């Protein structure tokens, strides 16, 4: 991203924060309906990667965690899409960074599984649980299984538990060895994984 684009993004982001600071993030659904905004509109804007529409809907009182009948929150969808701007808007509006879907996914798991390193970084900075697990596997295990060295480094730096075991006793190190990924294996051993 060029300097001009970065400056533009920061300007938009801080304007968004200023707008959101003036709106209630705990407004009731009737308040949102009174303004003509709905959770369905927010979810549609997030799915379409429409930053401005998301900002407008949040400023009109739509709650950032409104699921609109969907299994996922808007933050989870934005994380899956890799849209860091929308992720930051939703977080600034008070979205729950550790909310779980019915099947146990969180925004940080979805960002990591889709290879969105910058979004993972933003979510961790906002307090996402680095040791979250889903389906019996830790986030670190999921990242190691996918072979993503950079995200694994980030998770370890953020305090990911290198010793976490699945019900069958498998660790992240076992997964790295099974896929013959020597870089990940070395990283995990250096982080204290038992040989």
Regions found by a protein language model. Name each.
Residues 42, 75, 108, 140, ...:
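Conserved hydrophobic residue in the first alpha-helix
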């Amino acid at each position: 991203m060029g300097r001009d684009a970065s400056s533009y993004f920061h300007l938009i982001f801080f304007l968004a924060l200023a707008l959101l600071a003036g709106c209630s993030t705990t407004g009731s659904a009737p308040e949102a309906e009174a303004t003509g905004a709905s959770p369905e509109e927010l979810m549609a804007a997030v799915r379409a990667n429409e930053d401005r529409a998301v900002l407008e809907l949040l400023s009109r009182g739509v709650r950032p965690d409104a699921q609109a009948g969907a299994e996922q929150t808007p933050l989870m969808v934005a994380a899956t899409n890799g849209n860091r701007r929308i992720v930051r808007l939703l977080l600034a509006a008070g979205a729950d960074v550790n909310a779980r879907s019915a099947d146990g996914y969180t925004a940080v798991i979805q960002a990591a599984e889709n290879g969105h390193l910058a979004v993972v970084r933003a979510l961790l900075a906002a307090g996402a649980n680095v040791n979250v697990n889903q389906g019996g596997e830790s986030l670190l295990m999921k990242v190691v299984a996918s072979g993503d060295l950079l995200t694994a480094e980030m998770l370890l730096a953020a305090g990911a538990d290198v010793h976490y075991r699945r019900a069958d006793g498998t660790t992240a190190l076992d997964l790295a060895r099974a896929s013959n990924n020597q870089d990940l294996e070395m990283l995990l051993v250096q982080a204290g994984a038992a040989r």
